[in-house]
Amino acid sequence: MSTRNELVNLIDETYDVSQIEKEIALDNIALSDLELLATGGYSPLTGFLGKKDYDSVVETLRLVNGSVWSIPITLPVTEEVAESLKAGEEVKLVNAGNVYGVIQIEDIFVPDKEKEALLVYKTTDEAHPGVKKLYERPNVYVGGAIILTKRFENNPFPSYHLDPIETREEFKKRGWKTVVGFQTRNPVHRAHEYIQKSALEIVDGLFLNPLVGETKSDDIPADVRMESYEVLLQNYYPKDRVFLSVFPAAMRYAGPREAIFHALVRKNFGCTHFIVGRDHAGVGDYYGTYEAQEIFTNFTVEELGITPLFFEHSFYCAKCEAMASTKTCPHGKEDHVILSGTKVRELLRNGEVPPSTFSRKEVVEVLIKGLKKEVVTE
C-alpha cells in the first residue's frame, strides 16, 4: 500500500510501442486520468480499475486491499472495441492520432452504470453533469496496469503543470513541513480567500491547486481563472507562503466522494492538510451543504494520510465589517452578504460588477475581460 512518501511512477518514454497493433481511443477524461495514474497523482493506483477493485470502490470506497479510494477510475470502450480485445493483451492508448501509453489488459467487463451513478453520485438524474457524462461514455470497461509512453505537449499552462514529485520537491525546497491543499474550479472570491488565509495561520504553506481538466460548459474557462489566481496572489498573498500549480483532472461533480478523492490526490502532491468547505465538488442541490465534510467521519486520518480542515460557509458581515462565519459572527442573516462562485458568475454574465465585498477588484477586472472575450468568440 502506498504511504505518503511512496509515489507510483509509470512513465517510460523509451517504451517501444511499434510492435503493438491494437489500440484504444481515449476521451479527454481517460487521457487526463492516464497522466495522473502515471505521475503518481492517483497513487496507489497503477492502472484503470479491474472489476474487483471497481466493485469494491463503488460499494465500499476502498480498493480490494483496503486502501481508501472513492472514485472509480475507469477506461470505457464500445462493445465493438471490446469484442476485439482480450485479457493478457498489451494495447496502445491513443488520443487525436498520438500514442500516449499502453495498457496490459487484465479485465474486460460491463459495469452496472445505474448502480455506479446511484452510489458514486447519489442520483441517476441525467441532469447531473457527472451522471450525464457517465451515461454518455461507452458501456464496457477495460481494466489493467498502464505505462505512459509520451508526455502531453500542448499543455496550456506549462509553467504551472507540475507532477506530484515536483510539487513535493518544491515544498521541501521552501522548508514547508505542513502544507494545506485547496481545490477550486472557480475564481477565488473573498470567501475562499478568508478560508485559505485562516488555514495559512496554522500551516507553513498553501497549495492552490485549481482543476483545469474537463468541467461543465458554464464554468469560467481555465485560462481566465488562472489569470485571476495570478493577480490575486500577486496583490494579496505573501509570495513565500503560497504555491500555485494546476490539477489536470476532469471534474466529476460527485460531491462527498469527490471530496475524499481530492484529499487523497493532494496527499500525493505532498499536502499534509486539505480544505473542505461547504458543498465541496457539489452541483445543484444534489448534496447537503456539509455532506462532503461528514463523509470523512468514515475514515481515520491515518488511513487517509492527510488531515481534512473543515470550514463553515463564510460571508461578509456588514455589522462586523469583516469576513466571518457563523462560528465567529453573532449577527443575523440580514447583515450577511453571501458570496458564491455561482453568484459572481451570474453578476458578470449580466454585465454587473461584483462589489469589493465579493471579489478583489483586480480579479473582477480579469473576469470581465475574460468573459467579454468569451462572448466575442461564441
Swiss-Prot record:
EC number from the UniProt entry: 2.7.7.4
Enzymatic class: transferase
A biological process from GO: hydrogen sulfide biosynthetic process
A Pfam family it matches: PUA_2
Pathway connected to this protein: Sulfur metabolism; hydrogen sulfide biosynthesis; sulfite from sulfate: step 1/3
Domain of life: Bacteria
Annotated keywords: ATP-binding, Nucleotide-binding, Nucleotidyltransferase, Transferase
InterPro entries attached to this UniProt entry: ATP-Sase_PUA-like_dom, PUA-like_sf, Rossmann-like_a/b/a_fold, SO4_adenylyltransferase_pro, Sulfurylase_cat_dom, Sulphate_adenylyltransferase
Catalytic function, reaction form: sulfate + ATP + H(+) = adenosine 5'-phosphosulfate + diphosphate
GO molecular function: ATP binding; sulfate adenylyltransferase (ATP) activity
UniProt entry tagged with the keyword NADP: no
Family: Belongs to the sulfate adenylyltransferase family.
Protein name: Sulfate adenylyltransferase
Lineage of source species: Bacteria, Bacillati, Bacillota, Bacilli, Bacillales
Gene it is expressed from: sat
